Each structure stands twice: as structure tokens, then as C-alpha cells.
């Protein structure tokens, strides 16, 4: 349907409720999932017996400024899995006790992620090392400081997840789990 602009020229009607598909985001998601293509709707479909995530997320979610992670609180927690190689995601260390005097033991090998296990990590401290995966250097979050290309890679994928949540859908536990600290 066409409508006239103030200048008198006809312009196509633009839907306000849908966001353009980003091919780079889809490629990024396919890399995380492996070589086989997957349907986003099947990955992000609701599961029985779980609380709808949009109720747990800060509101309003759909109207945040930059259509990405901008404006979304860092209290969002996120955990991911690389289905192709098996992503190793370490849990966040417990807060240091003021009474502890012995040095912390050196970090050991990263635990391997299990599909049925929820590993919720603060967005600013997500480590993702997947041997053999081209995203090995793209998913490293250390103390909230990282280079723009690495941050942008993760923002691409998170944009898809947040868009589905804003449409009333939620993620499946085998791919992502997003909640907000209450």
C-alpha cells in the first residue's frame, strides 16, 4: 500500500512492528549451532512448565534505543552453547570474602558445558572458548572491556534473542537462558 509523503510523492508503507533481518546475525547464529541450518522459531519456542521470560525482563524491552544491547541493563544474564564443537563456559567465581587470607588457587581447565545445565553469567564477564570454532576469539568478555569487533559479534546474536523476547517468545534452555536479577 502506498501513501503520500508531505512533499506529495508516494512512498511505501513501512511496518513499525517488524525489524529487518540481519544476514550477519543469522550467519553468526549458524556458526554457533554448527553446519546445519536451524529455524529460529524452533530454537526460541516456548517450553512447558517454564515462566515466560518477558515477565522477568525489565520493561519496556521492545522500545529500547539502539535495537541491540544499548539501553538493556547489564543485570541480564546469558549463557550459550556451541553445538558444533561444544563450548566450554566457566562459572563466575564467588565473591572474595574479606576474611580470606589464603591466595586463590590457580584457574584450571574450563568445565565443558552440558546442554541440560544452566550456566548464568553476567554479560560483562562471559568467557567462551571453543577449540576449532572460528568464533574462538570473538566471544571473550573480560571485566566489561573488549574491542569493538568482539563486542559487535555478540551484539549481533543478542539482538536476535532480544527481538524474540520482545515479541513474547522466549529461549530454549539448550541454546540460551536470559533472566534479569530481581
Curated annotation (Swiss-Prot):
Renumbered residue ranges of the record's region Disordered: 1-22, 89-108
Species assigned in the record: Homo sapiens (Human)
Compositional bias (Pro residues): 91-108
Superkingdom of source: Eukaryota
Record domain DUF1725: where: 154-167
Name of the protein in question: Proline-rich protein, Y-linked
Amino acid at each position: 500500500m502506498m501513501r503520500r509523503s508531505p512533499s506529495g510523492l508516494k512512498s511505501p508503507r513501512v511496518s513499525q512492528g517488524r525489524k529487518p533481518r540481519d544476514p550477519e546475525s543469522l550467519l553468526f547464529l549458524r556458526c554457533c549451532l554448527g553446519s546445519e541450518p536451524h529455524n529460529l522459531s524452533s530454537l526460541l519456542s516456548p517450553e512447558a512448565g517454564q515462566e515466560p521470560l518477558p515477565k522477568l525482563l525489565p520493561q519496556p524491552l521492545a522500545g529500547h534505543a539502539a535495537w541491540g544491547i544499548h539501553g538493556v541493563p547489564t543485570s541480564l544474564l546469558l549463557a550459550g552453547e556451541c553445538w558444533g564443537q561444544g563450548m566450554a563456559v566457566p562459572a563466575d567465581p564467588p565473591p572474595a570474602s574479606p576474611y580470606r587470607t589464603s591466595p586463590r588457587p590457580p584457574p584450571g581447565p574450563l568445565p565443558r558445558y552440558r546442554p541440560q545445565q544452566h550456566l548464568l553469567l553476567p554479560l560483562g564477564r562471559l568467557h567462551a572458548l571453543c577449540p576449532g570454532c572460528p568464533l574462538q576469539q570473538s566471544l571473550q568478555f573480560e571485566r566489561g572491556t573488549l574491542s569493538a569487533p568482539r563486542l559487535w559479534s555478540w551484539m549481533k546474536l543478542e539482538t536476535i534473542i532480544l527481538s524474540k523476547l520482545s515479541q513474547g517468545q522466549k529461549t530454549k534452555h539448550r541454546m540460551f537462558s536470559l533472566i534479569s536479577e530481581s
